């Protein structure tokens, strides 16, 4: 393993902690041991926490079953989904038909993820039959480092709710306490997973130590390394191989990740934590290198008025394209995204008679910069000026927020007020001479665009009885245009739109929670959440093609009077309607458990031309969710709960893809995917002892042939064309029956 910066910093700390272990364990013998307290729904199923919270919130635990990937876990959330793109190496969360930076605020340990990945198309390694590059915002994180994900739909408190139109998803990584066994000061956590049918393998090892310091403090640290082998040359349910499709070649990759943390508690009132995480991969014609460093602290003295939290972080992600890889005709390209954030907030609590209140107020700053390098020595000047690749610019967001919770009797009112200042900086090039008639302004200039948004929200809940809580809410959210939208470079200055406005949404929700224990059996627990939501989105941003039509522009290619054609982002003149139902169910007992979710949704959001690969450059993804979808997990606990058996049923309703070709007017065609069957997975976990857990599984037990909804390759321009039906076939089938095994070792 390569000793990088994280290793050099943390290894000495681990050694110091280990040297103190003997002394600490001797001291621990004098500490009184308390009786064991059983807490339901905090580790195996963290979602139980949300059945007593008003609003659309969900949580999922990670790494419970062997080789159950992040896409499957997030898609089990009502209202949640993912955009699948095997060429990006990350996870892209979709909430209520929305995805991408600002529409969904995706975070890791509270740090926003701003990476935009772009795959190559040249060099014979990828898209060998002409499929173009594809781009997608995604989160580069190793699943083995994760413990849970918390998803808020529609709105979230604090920094997670800033610049988040449809919601947020926060992935939580392992801490020292997740590695150490009870009363141990040094520990190791190791995971290994393997799947046949080219699912691949992955492994992780994490070392941690913790020692008492000063009078009531502690010093802990961890160092973790993970590596995977991933490929897409699998056998489909119909017996064919994925590699039979040329666009599925060149996807084998070996990502590796490092993570380190140092946590110092000088006393019981305060804590400081320094974290570092690095992700490296070589995928689809480019090297990816992403690093995040953060410092967080908290201070909570014996006062109801002070609960101070601080977080600052910097993330830098680089993409360097291989010498033999191309983006359309571009060579030797590279991109860099650097993000810095700062958040400071305090929580105050007070009571007056029957009224209790909680107020959280804070400030949040984010600086987000994108840059690219296209060497003039290797690229034609015209190709550089008209490259639909890696727009450059800066995005600054400054925010103030106030979140409150008021409780009086059976009533709970959660209210928020978020104020944000959006700023976009970049350069609008001068328009080409042929484009002057349609370009405004036609000259080149530096753009410095500012917008301001004030978003109030409120949720009122009624605790009618101990187990039943209905609630209603009104939420306003917004998001800034992204650099890639305002400074789109597909046709030099003509495709840049410096007049874009932020998106804003008004969302109404009505729902209820049921949360009760001892329902059917002693020590069982039941949770149910049902929510209806209705959103109206103003100034929705999307990408369209425009054509030269005499003295003006038009949207239909059949009306064009010259060869002028360009793509540009605009604000939709009509309000986008987004509505649906979300239901989540969880039941747990000593003998068996049930987890379920159901989503039904519809949206009038227009599809961006950029979602088409051949004609729209693949600059973004198609995000319309299936009409409805559901996940049901049934499980049993045997042998004194050492053996857990579970079956997962995944239902997907009618789903679409963006057509590979366009209609006669040059507009997007939406095509219905073939009916997707119910997919069944089986898993078994056996806890040999506190040190060893063995895992096995079978994915797609019935070996069904189907397409995953919202898979970017469903619309690959390299799909086979059927001349008899004048359509492109659906050949991007998912993985057939696959066997998995895994082990988790702790000591």
PLM ranges: what are they?
Residues 350, 354, 407-413, 422, ...:
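Gram-negative outer-membrane beta-barrel transporters
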Residues 71-122:
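Extracytoplasmic beta-strand/coil segments of soluble accessory domains associated
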């Amino acid at each position: 393993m390569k000793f990088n910066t994280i290793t050099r910093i943390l290894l000495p700390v681990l050694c110091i902690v280990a040297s103190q272990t003997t002394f600490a364990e001797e001291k621990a013998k004098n500490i009184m041991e308390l009786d064991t307290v059983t807490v339901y729904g905090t580790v195996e199923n963290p979602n139980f926490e949300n059945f007593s919270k008003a609003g659309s919130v969900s949580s999922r635990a990670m790494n419970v079953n062997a080789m159950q990937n992040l896409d499957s876990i997030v898609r089990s959330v009502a209202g949640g989904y993912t955009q699948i793109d095997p060429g990006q190496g990350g996870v892209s969360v979709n909430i209520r038909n929305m995805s991408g930076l600002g529409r969904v605020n995706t975070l890791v340990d509270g740090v926003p993820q701003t990476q935009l990945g772009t795959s190559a198309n040249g060099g014979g390694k990828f898209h060998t039959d002409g499929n173009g590059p594809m781009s997608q915002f995604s989160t580069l994180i190793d699943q083995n480092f994760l413990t849970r994900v918390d998803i808020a739909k529609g709105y979230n408190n604090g920094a997670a709710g800033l610049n988040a139109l449809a919601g947020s998803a926060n992935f939580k990584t392992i801490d020292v306490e997740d590695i150490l066994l009870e009363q141990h000061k040094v520990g190791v956590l190791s995971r290994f997973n393997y799947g046949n049918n080219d699912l691949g393998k992955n492994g992780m090892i994490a070392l941690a130590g913790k020692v008492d310091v000063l009078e009531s403090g502690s010093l802990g640290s961890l160092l973790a390394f993970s590596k995977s082998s991933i490929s897409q040359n699998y056998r489909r349910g119909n017996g064919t191989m994925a590699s039979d499709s040329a666009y599925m070649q060149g996807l084998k990759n070996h990502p590796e990740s490092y993570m380190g943390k140092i946590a110092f508690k000088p006393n019981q009132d305060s804590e400081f934590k320094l974290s570092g995480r690095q992700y490296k991969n070589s995928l689809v014609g480019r090297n990816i290198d992403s690093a995040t460093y953060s410092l967080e602290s908290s201070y909570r003295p014996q006062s109801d008025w002070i609960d101070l939290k601080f977080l600052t972080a910097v993330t830098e992600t680089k993409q360097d394209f291989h010498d033999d890889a191309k983006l359309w005709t571009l060579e030797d390209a590279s991109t860099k995204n650097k993000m810095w954030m700062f958040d400071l907030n305090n929580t105050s609590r007070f009571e007056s008679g029957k009224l209790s209140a909680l107020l959280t107020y804070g400030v949040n700053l984010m600086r987000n910069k994108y840059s690219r390098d296209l060497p003039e020595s290797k690229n034609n000047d015209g190709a550089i000026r008209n490259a639909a690749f890696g727009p450059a610019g800066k995005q600054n967001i400054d925010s103030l927020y106030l979140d409150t919770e008021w409780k009086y009797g059976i009533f709970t009112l959660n209210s928020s007020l978020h104020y944000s200042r959006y700023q976009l900086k970049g350069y609008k090039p001068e328009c080409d001479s042929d484009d002057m008639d349609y370009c405004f302004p036609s000259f080149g200039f530096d753009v410095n665009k500012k917008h301001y948004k004030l978003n109030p929200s409120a949720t009122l809940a009624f605790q009618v009885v101990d187990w039943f809580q209905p609630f209603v809410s009104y939420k306003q959210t917004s998001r800034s245009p992204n650099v890639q939208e305002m400074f789109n470079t597909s046709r030099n200055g003509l495709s840049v739109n410096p007049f874009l406005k932020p998106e804003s949404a008004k969302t109404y929700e009505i729902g209820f929670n049921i949360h009760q224990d001892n329902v059917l059996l002693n020590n069982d627990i039941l949770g149910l959440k049902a929510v209806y939501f209705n959103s109206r989105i103003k100034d929705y941003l999307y990408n369209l093609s425009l054509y030269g039509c005499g003295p003006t522009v038009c949207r239909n290619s059949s009306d064009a009077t010259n060869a002028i054609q360009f793509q540009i982002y605009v604000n939709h003149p009509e309000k986008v309607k987004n509505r649906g139902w979300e239901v989540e169910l969880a039941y747990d007992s000593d003998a068996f458990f049930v987890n379920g979710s159901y989503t039904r949704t519809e949206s009038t959001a227009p599809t961006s031309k950029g979602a088409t690969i051949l004609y729209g450059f693949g600059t973004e993804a198609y995000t319309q969710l299936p009409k409805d979808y559901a996940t049901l997990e049934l499980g049993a606990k045997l042998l004194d709960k050492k053996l857990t058996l579970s079956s997962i049923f995944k239902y997907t309703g009618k789903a679409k893809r963006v057509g590979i070709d366009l209609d006669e007017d040059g507009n997007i065609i939406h095509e219905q995917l073939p009916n997707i069957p119910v997919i069944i997975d089986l898993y078994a976990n056996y806890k040999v002892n506190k040190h060893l857990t063995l895992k096995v599984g079978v994915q797609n037990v019935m070996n069904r042939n189907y397409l995953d909804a919202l898979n970017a390759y469903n619309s690959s321009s390299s799909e086979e064309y059927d001349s008899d039906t004048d359509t492109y076939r659906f050949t991007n089938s998912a993985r057939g029956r696959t066997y998995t095994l895994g082990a988790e070792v702790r000591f």
